[in-house]
């Protein structure tokens, strides 16, 4: 796990795989927050399994300088050393400077592959949107759940 922002550690990442989706407020302790760094999380499935999708729950709350991810990439590995990318998805920045507060469940589907380890990389947007009071400043990226199917 790439270290999150000191203020938003989410039990050192444990909340990412606890099966609980948080409400749309970043200060519940159930969100893991990143500022100017990518979320990089590795999930050990404890055994070889066939995997065909990964879901990543991310928060958008522009009033708190929080945007969802610019992109999410999913990698799989049998040994935890060599990873292969199986999916990558990019997202559009909100066009409304303040927008709504919401939690999005981003699903990345791919052909079923055997894996023991799943690496998820979520890249934040580089700047808040035009018209925002912090236009161009880096936003936070908040994630509260990663599900492997």
Predicted regions, residues:
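Selective for proline/serine-rich intrinsically disordered segments
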Residues: 1-2, 92, 112
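Surface-exposed loop and turn segments in beta-propeller and other repeat-based domains
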Residues: 91-97
């Amino acid at each position: 796990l790439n270290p999150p922002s000191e203020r938003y550690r989410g039990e050192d990442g444990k909340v990412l795989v606890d099966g609980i989706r948080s409400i749309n407020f970043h200060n519940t302790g159930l969100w893991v927050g990143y500022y100017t760094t990518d979320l990089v999380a590795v999930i050990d499935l404890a055994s070889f399994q066939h995997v065909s999708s990964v879901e990543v729950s991310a928060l958008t709350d522009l009033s708190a300088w929080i945007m969802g991810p610019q992109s999410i990439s999913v990698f799989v590995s049998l040994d935890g050393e060599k990873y292969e990318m199986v999916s990558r998805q990019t997202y559009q920045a909100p066009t409304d400077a303040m927008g709504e507060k919401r939690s999005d469940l981003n699903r990345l589907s791919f052909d079923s592959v055997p894996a023991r380890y799943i690496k998820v990389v979520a890249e934040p947007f580089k700047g808040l949107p035009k018209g925002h009071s912090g236009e161009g400043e880096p936003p936070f990226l908040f994630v509260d759940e990663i599900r492997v199917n």
